[in-house]
Amino acid sequence: METATLIAIFISCLIVSFTGYALYTAFGQPSKELRDPFEEHED
């Protein structure tokens, strides 16, 4: 394969994996450990 194709595939995989990790952190199991600053400072 050409170098440009490999670089494009590599960057695409990086973007997809980062997006998947961000969604897992936001909505998956680790989301229970996230704190909500708006709930901590109710008036």
UniProtKB/Swiss-Prot annotation:
Membrane topology: Single-pass membrane protein
Cellular component GO terms, alphabetical: chloroplast thylakoid membrane
Ranges annotated as spanning the membrane: 7-27
Principal subcellular localization: plastid
GO biological-process terms attached to the record: photosynthesis
Annotated compartments: Plastid, Chloroplast thylakoid membrane
Record flagged with keyword Membrane: yes
InterPro entries to which the protein is assigned, alphabetical: PSII_PsbN
Keyword RNA-binding in record: no
Keywords in alphabetical order: Chloroplast, Membrane, Plastid, Thylakoid, Transmembrane, Transmembrane helix
Family: Belongs to the PsbN family.
Role, per record: May play a role in photosystem I and II biogenesis.
Protein name: Protein PsbN
Annotated source species: Psilotum nudum
UniProt lineage: Eukaryota, Viridiplantae, Streptophyta, Embryophyta, Tracheophyta
